[in-house]
Amino acid sequence: MKVSASLVLLLAAAVLADDRCPPQDDPEQPPVLLAHPTDCDKFLICNHGTPVVSKCPPGLLWNDSQKQCDYPAQAQCAPGVTPNTEPAPKPSPNCPPEYDPDHMVYIPHETDCGKYYICDPYGVELEQTCPSGLHWNPVVNYCDFPELAQCEE
């Protein structure tokens, strides 16, 4: 019974997240950033209408009004959710030093055509996985049919 209740909550969170991301057909349109429905130290990057979960650096929480990770006193997040205590990842040399939310940076995965990276606001590569059967297409910056993505593993 506990497993069923957990599964229902997990599915409800996934549906909530999917409903929150607006459809994005224009690749030039800036990404939509949203608060995570249950974790204050996470946020959603809407990638062509699909929510991608990202984590704030340790000690910071998502500030939805500023659309960035912030100190807990400024973030005004719901109580009861503890911040991330993992050590902060190091910025990647592949990510630009200045974050521009209007121009997301996507990096193809080095060995897996079904994966890619998004550069977060702190210059860290966040690994993402395409839906089953699709490959990352760096020309259009979204998951695409393998014959169109032309990636060779």
From Swiss-Prot:
<keyword id="KW-1015">Disulfide bond</keyword>
<keyword id="KW-0325">Glycoprotein</keyword>
<keyword id="KW-0677">Repeat</keyword>
<dbReference type="InterPro" id="IPR036508">
    <property type="entry name" value="Chitin-bd_dom_sf"/>
</dbReference>
<keyword id="KW-0732">Signal</keyword>
<keyword id="KW-0147">Chitin-binding</keyword>
<feature type="domain" description="Chitin-binding type-2 1">
    <location>
        <begin position="18"/>
        <end position="79"/>
    </location>
</feature>
<feature type="disulfide bond">
    <location>
        <begin position="56"/>
        <end position="69"/>
    </location>
</feature>
<comment type="function">
    <text>Binds chitin but not cellulose. May be involved in the spatial organization of PM.</text>
</comment>
<protein>
    <recommendedName>
        <fullName>Peritrophin-1</fullName>
    </recommendedName>
</protein>
<dbReference type="GO" id="GO:0008061">
    <property type="term" value="F:chitin binding"/>
</dbReference>
<dbReference type="GO" id="GO:0005576">
    <property type="term" value="C:extracellular region"/>
</dbReference>
<dbReference type="Pfam" id="PF01607">
    <property type="entry name" value="CBM_14"/>
</dbReference>
<feature type="signal peptide">
    <location>
        <begin position="1"/>
        <end position="17"/>
    </location>
</feature>
<feature type="disulfide bond">
    <location>
        <begin position="130"/>
        <end position="143"/>
    </location>
</feature>
<feature type="glycosylation site" description="N-linked (GlcNAc...) asparagine">
    <location>
        <position position="63"/>
    </location>
</feature>
<feature type="domain" description="Chitin-binding type-2 2">
    <location>
        <begin position="92"/>
        <end position="153"/>
    </location>
</feature>
<dbReference type="InterPro" id="IPR002557">
    <property type="entry name" value="Chitin-bd_dom"/>
</dbReference>
<dbReference type="InterPro" id="IPR051940">
    <property type="entry name" value="Chitin_bind-dev_reg"/>
</dbReference>
